[in-house]
Curated annotation (Swiss-Prot):
It is found in: Cell membrane. Induction: Expressed in methanol-grown cells. It catalyses: methanophenazine + H2 = dihydromethanophenazine. This is F420 non-reducing hydrogenase I cytochrome subunit. Part of the F420 non-reducing hydrogenase I complex that catalyzes the reduction of methanophenazine to dihydromethanophenazine. Composed of a large subunit (VhoA), a small subunit (VhoG) and a cytochrome subunit (VhoC). GO terms for molecular function: metal ion binding; oxidoreductase activity. GO terms for biological process: methanogenesis; respiratory electron transport chain. GO terms for cellular component: plasma membrane. It comes from Methanosarcina mazei (strain ATCC BAA-159 / DSM 3647 / Goe1 / Go1 / JCM 11833 / OCM 88) (Methanosarcina frisia). Belongs to the HupC/HyaC/HydC family. Keywords: Cell membrane, Electron transport, Heme, Iron, Membrane, Metal-binding, Methanogenesis, Oxidoreductase, Transmembrane, Transmembrane helix, Transport.
Length: 271
């Protein structure tokens, strides 16, 4: 990371207020759903079944609204024009070749070979992040989206076997599709959906452990928790896992050009 004489210039907005709201609501709703869901399944006695089911059903719309409305809005409100928005989405949330290189560097660092690569990179010239997520998080995002879809689909049937939307028999359609898969495992369609719902719950628990317990175990990443839950800011004077690419000014270009010419003249003098 280059030096900067103005430390304030190196403090940038990492998360908007809507980003922070989305993440906080997502976290609370997910924790409530995991606890109440396991209570309903296992029959724990710390709360009544009625209370657990009520809290579960209250948390569901919050989780879905955040993930299927607010988060997509936050993502695609960045960037200019259609291609700019697509570029922002792929650079920030899709695991690509550069992320593979960073992940390779992270693995090497684990075995004490090389420096831990920066994964939060801000370009001052462009005025936005080039990337801000850990490579592993980009993989988890895709898996979480898939798990969220599956747990929602299976949850519809567990909520009400004949649930419909605008007269469309959604639950029955889900049961019919499940009926094509369930016999392979010697299960009924509803039994298969119940197992799928439970497995996706375990997945979210695993993801929570990886996200908070492992990736967040390093004290140097705690600055990102402060940013996502409170300040929204990232201070690039802290060099851990971050890089601030400074603006390449005309003065820098002239200085570099003069240096190149001086080197050439020095070379000619030698000859």
């Amino acid at each position: 990371m280059k030096s900067n004489n103005n430390p304030k210039a190196m403090v940038v907005e990492r998360y908007t207020i809507t980003d922070r709201i989305a993440h906080t609501v997502h976290a609370i709703a997910m924790i409530v759903l995991i606890i109440t869901g396991l209570k309903i399944y296992a029959g724990w006695e710390f709360m009544s079944f009625h209370t657990a089911r009520t809290l579960h059903m209250i948390a569901v719309p919050f989780l879905l609204a955040v993930n299927w409305i607010l988060i997509p809005y936050n993502i695609f409100s960045e960037g200019h024009g259609l291609m700019g928005k697509i570029s922002h989405f792929t650079d920030h949330y899709i695991f690509g070749p550069k992320d593979a290189v960073r992940l390779g560097g992270i693995i090497k660092n684990f075995f004490r070979k090389g420096r831990y690569p920066a994964y939060s990179i801000y370009d001052e010239e462009k005025g936005h992040y080039e990337t801000k997520l850990h490579p592993v998080m980009k993989v988890l995002i895709v898996l979480e989206g898939t798990a969220l879809f599956l747990i929602t689909v299976s949850g519809i049937v567990l909520y009400k076997l004949d649930w419909s939307l605008f007269g469309l028999p959604i639950a029955q359609w889900i049961i019919s599709i499940s009926g094509m898969i369930a016999p392979t495992f010697g299960m009924t369609p509803v039994g298969f959906l119940r197992l799928l719902h439970l497995l996706m719950t375990y997945w979210f628990i695993f993801e929570l452990v990886v996200h908070v317990g492992i990736l967040g175990f390093d004290p140097h990443v705690w600055k990102y928790y402060k940013a996502i839950f409170w300040s929204g800011k990232e201070d690039f004077s802290d060099p851990y896992y971050s890089e601030y690419v400074e603006k390449y000014s005309r003065f820098d270009a002239k200085k570099e050009h003069k240096q190149v010419n001086a080197n050439k003249e020095h070379g000619h003098q030698k000859h």
